[in-house]
Amino acid sequence: MALALTGWQLVWGACVCVLVHGQQAPPGQGSDPGRWRQLIQWENNGQVYSLLNSGAEYVPPGPQGSEANSRVLLAGAPQAPPRRRGGLRRRQAPSLPLPGRVGSDTVRGQARHPFGFGQVPDNWREVAVGDSTGMARARTSVSQQRHGGSASSVSASASAFASTYRQPSSFPQQQFPYPQAPFVSQYETYDPSTRTYDQGYVYYRSASGGLGAAAVASAGVVYPFQPRARYEEYGGGGGEEQPEYPPQGFYPAAPERPYAPQPADGLDRRYSHSLYHEGTAGLEPAYPDPGPDAAQPNGGGGGGTYGGGGGDPRLGWYPPYGNMPPEAYSPPRVVEPQPPFRVLEPPYLPVRSSDAPPPGSERNGAQQGRLSVGSVYRPNQNGRGLPDLVPDPNYVQASTYVQRAHLYSLRCAAEEKCLASTAYAPEATDYDVRVLLRFPQRVKNQGTADFLPNRPRHTWEWHSCHQHYHSMDEFSHYDLLDAATGKKVAEGHKASFCLEDSTCDFGNLKRYACTSHTQGLSPGCYDTYNADIDCQWIDITDVQPGNYILKVHVNPKYIVLESDFTNNVVRCNIHYTGRYVSTTNCKIVQS
């Protein structure tokens, strides 16, 4: 028993000695201030960087003399060597050490500003930023250090971070006038002096005829990037035959244009005759249409620079028509400007003719409207055209529904006579429920003139409930017809709204608003009435369930002149169940 107790005491004593001895770091390892203790890696813009620190990770408060000698190293790229005076050198990849070079010597590559603005000064030596070659060495050295490396391995890894070596090329180098380094994404400043590739790269010609590049690093890292091919290499190399065409610049030189007289006002009106000028029959067109006779500009034979190949002579100065003489200048005619809209031909206007009028027909232009002037149609309306209101049937069908509301919430609409006659009876109370068939409306002016109210401005009516002026007595009629007989089953009303440009097609400007002086509807614009505004309904409180027809008629009395009155009515099939409605088959009809 005593022998066993003595043995256990010896074992515990040995353990205590080992622990005490382990806390004392041998020189050159834990107490070595030059040892790298921390490694931080991150990636920025596709490049991996490393930050090495010889200090401790956690520093206690207070002055620490041992941490004052700690070092910090940022690794990840070769550093910049002195620039040669002969010209600007490309950025080089790390390579194997040269024969006879000591490991402590360094060859700095050309470092660049992180944003590409020129070169980094040479005095910025301690910290270098670049490609990920140093990171491969960082991982190698750190792994060696973690697996029991000695102080010599630590110093070797430190020198690996701060050094980049070059290797002589195993292939014969070829000089190129304008090389492009594979790792530089920014454009460098042009230097007229001679440029060559660095010896650190190995350029080889692939089987496809292009050039490839491989950077052989000391860590065995191969970069798969290749330089951009130049003009000389599109034809291939080696046994392939180069084309006989001489090299040319990025922008080919254009042939010199012959002198053409300029008009007095400096405006070029060669393309305006067929669009805006009347009476062009007496004038020769600026560009004749290409035809069999125009196939050979040089008289069907040779001559000229390009041999007079066939084609469109209006191509002007571009080959193969560079030898075409300039067209003769024709003085402009004073004409009335036209709106850029295509007016629709109403049925009561004469049939358009594509034949040009005789030369003497310009004198009768005041009595007869021009029927065909290029692609612009001008009827005898003093060049102003007419509006054309068209309601949108899909807009009506999309949002038709039934609403039940108390009469006290419809007082403003009652003042404008938007309810059925039973709502104005003496026995009606504010708590009576009215059933309303609500639907939206969107009207477009697809004509060539403004749709303006027929009433003078000083006669517009002010409605205090809705806070706007009514410029028309009857802009729309809303009626509900029986589907079988076509008779009215609900007391529709005359919607009297203010006219404005709610929205416009692309290229058209809104010019009218719901104010006391600017009401109307511009060409290419829409006057929209949502289903939730007052009077945008039909009172169907007294209507029985069944099938009906909803009729929306715009400009019903034809008071404002339009170019087409056959597209002012929308009809929809309504199925009313007593609780809700379903709307189908909304379309534009004549009446």
Curated annotation (Swiss-Prot):
Residue ranges of the region described as Interaction with FBLN5: 319-386
Cellular compartments per GO CC: collagen-containing extracellular matrix; extracellular space
Enzyme Commission number: 1.4.3.13
Residues bearing the modification 2',4',5'-topaquinone: 529
Keyword flag Disulfide bond: yes
Leader sequence residues: 1-22
Pfam family, one: Lysyl_oxidase
Necessary cofactors: Cu cation; lysine tyrosylquinone residue
Primary localisation category: secreted
Stretches the record annotates as Lysyl-oxidase like: 387-591
Disulphides: 412-418, 465-514, 498-504, 525-535, 572-586
Domain of life: Eukaryota
Prosegment location in residue numbers: 23-91
GO MF annotation list: copper ion binding; protein-lysine 6-oxidase activity
Numbered residues of crosslink Lysine tyrosylquinone (Lys-Tyr): 494-529
Basic residues bias: start-end ranges: 82-92
Site (Cleavage) residue list: 91-92, 130-131, 147-148, 213-214, 354-355
UniProt biased composition (Gly residues): 298-313
Statement: the UniProt record of this protein carries the keyword Secreted: yes
InterPro entries: LOX-like_protein (IPR050912), Lysyl_oxidase (IPR001695), Lysyl_oxidase_CS (IPR019828)
Subcellular location: Secreted, Extracellular space; Secreted, Extracellular space, Extracellular matrix
Reactions this protein catalyses: L-lysyl-[protein] + O2 + H2O = (S)-2-amino-6-oxohexanoyl-[protein] + H2O2 + NH4(+)
Protein name: Lysyl oxidase homolog 1
